[in-house]
Amino acid sequence: MTGAVTSWPGAGAGRPPAQLPVPALELGEGPCWDAATGALYWIDGPPGRVHRLDVHGLHASWDVGQPVGAVFPRAGGGLLVAARDGFLALDTRTGAVELLAPVEADRPGNKLNDGACDRAGRLFAGTMAADESPGAGALYRLDADLTLTPLVTGVGISNGIGWSPDDRLMYYSDSLAYRVDVFDYDPATGAVSGRRPFTPVGGGPVMPDGLAVDAEGGVWVAHWGGSVLTRYDPAGRPDRAVRFPQANVTSCAFGGPGLDRLYVTTAGGAGGPAGGLFVLSPGVTGLPSYPFGG
């Protein structure tokens, strides 16, 4: 991989990424900006908690009773949570949880992990084995009518998903493949085709995790085990890197009224600090997080 990489302390002007004053996280994941309410959502995976930081800076959280992988606002209100048993509806007013769409009920060792919604409100998320067995997971599309369509099988750890600014490409990381791939994407139907490598990431204990795409087509990839968030240009060349105190950088999402902030989640590790939620000014605006249409 060629290309000059600018190593950033984080927020620009020599400032490191700012850690936000929210509860420590065991395995923070899945930040998602809700433009309709000006709130940021994220999850703590193993404890099964969904977190929110609202427009006034007030924190709230909900326990869904099982491990979770990601959270998405719903167009009609409330949240959709990717969890161990499938897709759950979470009523943030009452805390009530309902299983809307079971996933891989015949594979009790599997669980949903990361995901994202496209501009049309279709949700893409994948599974992984709890013991991280290679090839045990799959990638799915959940439509607004709750139709679940398998797209890719033989996945190791299904992780970050994002789209190019013109919606014609979909980026996808399978952590155990040590790379981010790219598909041709049909925004009219949600079909994917032509999977091919976009960029290798990591090796050994360092793996690609969640990702986000900016308005210039740059792909920001979290490195589990690498203490870093790296931006790759549209050709797959690394050009910026942001360092974090935790080894396990897990995911990122653009947010703020101008989509000019980048929120980053991390996880704790043996002998290191607990996971947290960070924010930085990346010097570029991002693409929005879209709500689930169902």
State each model region's role:
Residues R179, F183, P200-P234:
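Loop/turn-rich, solvent-exposed surfaces of beta-rich toroidal or solenoidal domains
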